[in-house]
Amino acid sequence: MQRLFAGKLRFAFRHFPLTEVHPWAEPAAEAAEYAATQGLFWEMHDSLYANQDELGLPLILALGRALGVSDLGLRDALAQRTFASKINDDFIGGVRSGVNGTPSFFINGEKHQGSFAYEELAAAIDARLHAGAAP
């Protein structure tokens, strides 16, 4: 999408950990935020997502190590819940915006109710652009 709508699209990621479904979702989000301090947010996010069914502290730390994330720093950030308030703020903001699951997409502040298929999202963004509203 970002390539298709280069210069016309702003992408904002928000955490929405569903802890009742994934007990390690919140620590995983915190780990991704710590990795972001080292420029490795998306790499950590993708590794955590790919391994979401096996997550636990040992695996989160191992994934971080594999990416070159500081092991001691990550342990500290998780133990002290350094990024917990940011994750909570993202979650509360999502609830207030009508998010009740993931993934959720908003186009120009309006929740996309259709399919998440590439073609449908692209068509919805394109329709907004042609209506004069920047997504």
Model regions: which residues?
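Structural alpha/beta surface segment adjacent to cysteine/selenocysteine redox centers
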Residues: M1-R65, D126, A131-P135
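C-terminal cap of thioredoxin/glutaredoxin-like
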Residues: M1-Q2, P58-P135
